[in-house]
Amino acid sequence: MENLQVNQREKKTRHSSRQCRRKGLVPGVIYGKGINNFLFEIGELELNHALSVTGEHGLLSINSQEGSLNTLIKEVQRDPVTRRVLHIDLEKVEGNEEIETAVPINYVGEEYINKLDAVLQKNLDSIKVKCSPSNIPKGVNLNVGRAKPGDQFKIADVEFGNEITVVDDLNSIVASVSYDQKIITQEVVDQEVAENRAKKES
């Protein structure tokens, strides 16, 4: 678990958030059972490093003037263009009590699908699970390397450890494989050109 030092933030306004970011800081909030919402700011570089280690659904140990808390990352808001972190929401966790969180899906072998002139259509980028904080995985792998057009993958096809309970419907479609529409369209155009040429020659 990554340890981060944060400073309390007094105001929650759009202006104060912009000021915070101009200083190279990211505004955030901690909430949970038995505590009042705690507004804070943290260095952008330190936060980016922590997210690269834990992922965007992992655990963070937060140290502040109020003491230390173990927290779960609930939401990371990013700028849609620059991808810089704009805000982060954290939830206090108690000991090893089970919690629900979303775990990212890592699609393994997608490059082999592309070699088949096919595309992988991803319906989900994460799966909701329930487990103790210490057992939260950084991500789960779904091997799609042997897939062919027409194949579908369900949540049930993803492997989880026995210590993890899947909250989402196991029959939900995670991804499917289909032919590349651009290639199909080009083939149709080529065929029509060939047919028109044959008609003119006849």
Curated annotation (Swiss-Prot):
Keyword Ribosomal protein found: yes
Cellular component, GO annotation: cytosolic large ribosomal subunit
Molecular function GO labels: 5S rRNA binding; structural constituent of ribosome
Keyword Ribonucleoprotein: yes
Keywords, comma-separated and alphabetical: Ribonucleoprotein, Ribosomal protein, RNA-binding, rRNA-binding
Gene3D superfamilies given in the database record: Ribosomal protein L25, beta domain (2.170.120.20), Ribosomal Protein L25, Chain P (2.40.240.10)
Family the UniProt entry places it in: Belongs to the bacterial ribosomal protein bL25 family. CTC subfamily.
Subunit structure as annotated in this protein's UniProt entry: Part of the 50S ribosomal subunit; part of the 5S rRNA/L5/L18/L25 subcomplex. Contacts the 5S rRNA. Binds to the 5S rRNA independently of L5 and L18.
Matching NCBIfam families: bL25_bact_ctc (TIGR00731)
Full protein name: Large ribosomal subunit protein bL25
Protein source organism: Clostridium perfringens (strain ATCC 13124 / DSM 756 / JCM 1290 / NCIMB 6125 / NCTC 8237 / Type A)
UniProt lineage: Bacteria, Bacillati, Bacillota, Clostridia, Eubacteriales
Gene that this polypeptide is encoded by: rplY
